[in-house]
């Protein structure tokens, strides 16, 4: 057999890339994410992005969290067969953002510090999960913790991050053109 999957399988895999983004993940409705979202991590139509999708749920310990799935691709490696550290960080950061947005009730931006650790990098071609929850919450600040787990539930990595409310005035002063769906969620 030659390199890569047989031609018929390659055609099938190519057709999957053209499907509409999933609306359900593990039987739970996905969190709303506009198709025009340009984000590399979670933009549902980003041509080269990770296209991460999340749902909100209650964990076994009763804590609310966001959860998603991802399968590293063969062109997303650092070391052979291992997901690139920067992309692993991105998955964890995206989950943290969605936890802040969904569980914090408004739009937040990261402020630092951010602490990233990798016990083991996710393996290419295997399904992994990412989850994030708030570990501290106040009106003007949040702390989130995200974790990735591999098959069998083994911890792959963790990211702790700090967040503050997004400000419309700060975005305007910086000249950042934001879509209305984001501006509507921001503090003045």
Task: Please name every model-derived segment.
Residues 62-67, 113, 127-129, 141-143, ...:
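Intrinsic-disorder/low-complexity, polar/charged segments enriched in Ser/Thr/Lys/Arg/Asp/Glu/Gln
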Residues 87-95:
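Short amphipathic alpha-helical face segments that pack within enzyme cores
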Residues 68-70, 114-118, 132, 146, ...:
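A structural signal for short, well-ordered beta-strand segments
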């Amino acid at each position: 057999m030659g390199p890569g999957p047989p031609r018929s399988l390659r055609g099938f895999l190519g057709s999957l890339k053209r499907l509409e983004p999933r609306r359900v993940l593990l039987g739970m409705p996905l969190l709303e994410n506009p198709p025009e979202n340009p984000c590399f991590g979670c933009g549902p139509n980003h041509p080269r992005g990770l296209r991460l999708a999340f749902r909100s749920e209650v964990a076994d310990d009763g804590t609310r969290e966001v959860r998603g799935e991802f399968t590293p691709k063969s062109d997303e490696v650092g070391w052979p067969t291992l997901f690139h550290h920067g992309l692993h960080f991105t998955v964890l950061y995206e989950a943290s953002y969605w936890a802040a947005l969904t569980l914090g009730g408004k739009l937040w931006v990261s402020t630092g510090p951010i602490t990233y650790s990798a016990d083991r990098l996710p393996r290419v071609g295997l399904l992994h999960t990412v989850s994030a929850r708030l570990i501290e919450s106040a009106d003007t600040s949040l702390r989130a913790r995200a974790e990735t787990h591999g098959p069998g539930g083994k911890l792959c990595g963790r990211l702790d991050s700090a967040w503050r409310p997004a400000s419309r005035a700060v975005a305007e002063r910086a000249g950042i053109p934001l879509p209305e769906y984001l501006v509507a969620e921001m503090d003045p």
